[in-house]
Amino acid sequence: MRELKHELLPTRHTQVFHEDKDKMEFNAPHHFVVVPAGSPLVDQQIHYGRGGNSKKVTVKDFAGKLATVNFQLGPVTEHGANGVMNEDLIAMVITRLQYFQNSEFNCRENAMAITKLEEALMWLNKRTAEREQRGVEGTHEK
């Protein structure tokens, strides 16, 4: 696995990893692991997929893993719901920030983050609606 690096992602407390490019399917990473910063690596076998479609993939797992996120792999119409959607994670973060906003921890920065995350959901929903209109949603067609 490789570490997710982004100039705006702090790594003081946690680090995020995803599968190597040669293990990716459908042009994007689908499997993420969040660990405490500086966690030692451990080899482990993990099964990805469902039933007869599952395949054994060697990945790097981590001692003290905090979370694993497996995104939808392939179109739902072809593969069924088998993972988290981008929109699901964005909605989770919005909900968490809204709870902070309804407490003594409210602040302008959280309000701005909520607005921008809601905007991100709007753009993703717009893309889906346009793909549905063209009859290509749930396929690998543009």
UniProtKB/Swiss-Prot annotation:
Binding site for 3'cADPR: 72, 74, 96, 100, 105, 110, 127, 131, 138
Protein family membership: Belongs to the Tad1 family.
Pfam families in the cross-refs: Acb2_Tad1_hairpin (PF24729)
Mutant phenotype after disruption: Knockdown decreases phage infectivity about 100-fold.
Gene: tad1
The protein, known as: Thoeris anti-defense 1
More about this protein: Although 2'cADPR has been crystallized with Tad1 (AC P0DW58) we have chosen to show 3'cADPR binding here, as evidence suggests 3'cADPR is produced by ThsB2 (AC J8CSK2) and 3'cADPR activates ThsA better than 2'cADPR (AC J8G6Z1).
Protein's UniProt keywords contain Nucleotide-binding: yes
Annotated function: Blocks activity of the Thoeris antiviral defense system (ThsA and ThsB, AC J8G6Z1, J8G8J6) when expressed in B.subtilis normally susceptible to SBSphiJ group phages. When added to phage SBSphiJ (which does not naturally encode this gene) confers resistance to Thoeris. Inhibits Thoeris upstream of ThsA. Probably acts by binding and sequestering cyclic ADP-D-ribose signal molecules produced upon viral infection (3'cADPR or 2'cADPR); sequestration prevents the signal from activating the ThsA of the Thoeris antiviral defense system.
Taxonomic source organism: Bacillus phage SBSphiJ7
GO biological process: symbiont-mediated suppression of host innate immune response
Keywords: Host-virus interaction, Inhibition of host innate immune response by virus, Nucleotide-binding, Viral immunoevasion
One annotated GO molecular function: nucleotide binding
Superkingdom assignment: Viruses
Record text on subunit structure and interactions: Homodimer.
Domain notes: Upon ligand binding the C-terminus changes conformation, enclosing the ligand.
